[in-house]
């Protein structure tokens, strides 16, 4: 176990060094990033996303679940003050055949302040009830790409979830942005994120309904569709 603890600490430290070299940490305009991506960081079965001073951890293997307390301690130590809270969210990611009972919850800290920043845009992150770790962190470059193409266009963001693509489209100069998701909770979150960044901006409309039915009814008014 001692050897395993040292290995985890070393690899988390390596993960922080790499993200620092990539200029993902200690930025005023960005505090959302993926710290650990499984095998890519030599920690198979583990995903850790960072939102400000909170790290959200998902175990996809029994081994990582068993080591969760060690990982939480090592994470805070390796972060050198960047991380204060560790939220464990593995109820739906652990192998069901392992018959492990583990409720989601904080392993360290207890901060529910959930506004984080990506490329200068603010987002409410719902790591308690949201999908994945609360935000699709791996879509950062795609969101920026949509922003690049959005100027002067009528945009439809299908299955919008948090509305991340919608907010980027608004900053990119879209004429109109429609956000559609069958989940009323997702639409509530999307509206909150749009209002957080562009208060009172009537270019954004959000709809809690079937995205494909909305697409059929939208006709030819759309010039950019994100699925």
Give, region by region, the residue ranges found by the protein language model.
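Conserved short alpha-helical segments that host acidic/polar catalytic motifs at enzyme active sites
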Residues: 8-38
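Short histidine-centered catalytic/ligand-binding loop motif
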Residues: 4-5, 56-65
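Divalent cation-coordinating acidic motifs and surrounding scaffolds
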Residues: 53
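Non-catalytic substrate-recognition/targeting regions of SAM-dependent transferases
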Residues: 36-49, 65-136
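Conserved short hydrophobic interaction patches
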Residues: 15, 74-78, 193
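Short helix-terminating capping/connector loops at secondary-structure junctions
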Residues: 27-29, 81-82, 199-202
């Amino acid at each position: 176990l001692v050897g395993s603890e040292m290995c985890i600490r070393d690899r988390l430290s390596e993960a922080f060094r790499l993200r620092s070299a990539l200029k993902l940490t200690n930025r005023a305009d960005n505090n959302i990033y993926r710290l650990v991506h499984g095998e890519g960081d030599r920690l198979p079965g583990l995903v850790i996303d960072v939102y400000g001073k909170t790290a959200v951890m998902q175990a996809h293997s029994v081994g990582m679940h068993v080591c969760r307390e060690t990982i939480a301690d090592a994470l805070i130590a390796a972060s050198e003050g960047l991380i204060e809270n560790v939220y464990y969210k593995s109820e739906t990611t652990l192998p069901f055949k392992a018959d492990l009972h583990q409720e989601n919850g904080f392993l360290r800290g207890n901060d529910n302040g959930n506004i984080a920043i990506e490329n200068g845009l603010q987002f409410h992150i719902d790591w308690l009830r949201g999908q994945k770790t609360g935000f699709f962190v791996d879509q950062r470059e795609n969101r920026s790409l949509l922003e690049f193409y959005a100027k002067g266009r009528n945009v439809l963001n299908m299955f919008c979830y948090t509305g991340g693509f919608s907010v980027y489209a608004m900053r990119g100069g879209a004429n109109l942005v429609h956000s559609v998701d069958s989940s009323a909770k997702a639409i509530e979150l999307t509206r909150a994120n749009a209002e957080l960044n562009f208060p009172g901006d009537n270019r954004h409309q959000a709809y809690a309904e079937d995205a494909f039915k909305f697409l059929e009814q939208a006709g030819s008014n759309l010039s950019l569709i994100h699925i």
